[in-house]
Amino acid sequence: CRNEIVALIDEHLTDENVAKELAYFTAPFRASFERPYGYGWLLALAQELKQSSLPQAAVWYQTLEPLTQDIRNRLVDYLSKLTYPIRVGTHYNTAFALALGLDYARAVQDSGLEQSILTAAERFYLADTRYPAHYEPGGDEYISGALTEALLMSKVTDNFPAWFDKFLPDVETVVALMNPAEVCDRTDRKIAHLDGLNLSRAWCMNHIAKALPENHPG
């Protein structure tokens, strides 16, 4: 199975294919294509290739680099003109892309990108208090606006526990967050996004818990 996966990546991750992807992004009227969700995942892929122990990964990383740098620059430009964060629990969520982008920036020691993300995160989220998490989830969301923001800020602020206590002061009582979302029809491709919400919530909670003291009431 591993050999098949490696062969498949070798087949698809080529200079020619990356050039086609880059051309698609840089064509007229595509400035907002896959922004910011696709940006975050592309940078996450680059990070995985950078940190992978597979002997082929270094070649894949270099092959992807032209597209990676283009997306990196697009993210910086986007953050420079984004007046307000997007908090919806779908592809447009700002905090989700910033969390992935920040991990990439630190992995490759891109201080310029890191600072751009830190500045944006603090501008958007540092003053947030009493987030209305009891209104979650939306009917076809797969990201928790509350938990994804908290995940990002656990990577941003030095005093995360204090920030978190103001952001979600009664988190343990928020039934909507503390219980899995109900998926009533998995044949409906939009409603089935709620399965993804349960997974992404668990991912966020795992990271958030590690950033809080063991005796934290949440």
What is each of the regions a protein language model found here?
Residues 1-105:
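Extended ligand-binding groove/face enriched in aromatic
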Residues 108-112, 116-218:
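Long, repeat-rich segments with strong aromatic
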